[in-house]
């Protein structure tokens, strides 16, 4: 049931002096886009009559089929806490529809709903996500452009005066709470200038909406503090990168399908099949969960990011960890995902991988309770531990050869995603980087 009715929204915008409405959506690369309308056009928006040119959006449609419609999700209505000069701004997150009234297959949000329908057909009622997005704060220069100077030199769980981002982080939390977020914790992360704010899990679509809103709020409030917030996975060499650990759980009629108090580790057969599916498809879905050239600079040994496909209930070196909580809180934590990922697409491939394990009753390998980082290559091979792709190019090749993952995106999204990412890789591959000049200019 919607949090607001149409009548509630029309009343609120008058009472709160809302002057503009943002109709937001997400493109294939995970970038937030919007069409902004004056409040006088609210009725038109609520009638699903607002059009936009889909050919101008990365991965949408060709110019000869460009008309698309924005259908606002009333559940996502919120008034931004910060006020513009001429009045308040509210927003809806929208689904994209074709002119004939059918969902647009290139809309990442619609795609996640399609995979959730497949989940429901298997008898499950809910798929929850608890994300842990990390970000860096850099100083701005006098022109308002980002610099490479970090805001502080703090470390894990530091506090002021070492943690100079504390006030900015607090303001972000307050703004998020005003927008309906339930914030569980916030703290300084391992690297200098790195931060994490954890918010409560929610259903799959709502949680992905929250991730997109979170990124927008973090960047907006950081700029008010003279800072630039980035969710780039590895902005600096020699320090930890930013991840977005994803805590996943399946429910059946209000009961956590991953929990069985009488089973080994109190993990149900459903949970073990789900883990097996994640393990089987990990090297393929990495192209979506870690979608940039820079993502693979994070997935290297020594910086607490997973490089190897394994699972454990005890240690944090594998791809998959099972946190200690049980009962309704039983969950599978996938640790490779980074915050550059399009959350709707990332969750689509993660759910599809897990469901494939459940449908085919795949057997999970034995858990690995040793520190994988110190194991030799031979030891890893003996234990059936494979490496995650080392580059975006490797990840794309793995992805293209996996039928389950291709179907998880659907033909339209798959083709446009691959096209965009192969162009990105080729641009990187042919670029001459500063390291090369430093290494070779004098030597040769």
UniProtKB/Swiss-Prot annotation:
Binding site for Mg(2+) 1: 132, 245, 333
Keywords: ATP-binding, Cytoplasm, Ligase, Magnesium, Metal-binding, Nucleotide-binding
Outcome following mutation: residue 43 to E: In strain: PCI 219
Effect of residue 59 to R: Unable to form stable complex with TnrA. In the presence of glutamine, this mutant derepresses amtB-lacZ fusion and glnRA-lacZ fusion
Catalytic reaction annotation: L-glutamate + NH4(+) + ATP = L-glutamine + ADP + phosphate + H(+)
Effect of residue 253 to D: In strain: PCI 219
Primary site of residence: cytoplasm
Residue positions binding ATP: 184, 249, 316, 321
Phenotype caused by lack of the gene: In cells lacking this gene, expression of glnR, tnrA, nasB, nrgAB, gabP and ure genes is derepressed.
Function of the molecule: Glutamine synthetase (GS) is an unusual multitasking protein that functions as an enzyme, a transcription coregulator, and a chaperone in ammonium assimilation and in the regulation of genes involved in nitrogen metabolism. It catalyzes the ATP-dependent biosynthesis of glutamine from glutamate and ammonia. Feedback-inhibited GlnA interacts with and regulates the activity of the transcriptional regulator TnrA. During nitrogen limitation, TnrA is in its DNA-binding active state and turns on the transcription of genes required for nitrogen assimilation.
Name of the protein in its database record: Glutamine synthetase
Naturally occurring in which organism (per UniProt): Bacillus subtilis (strain 168)
Gene symbol of the encoding locus: glnA
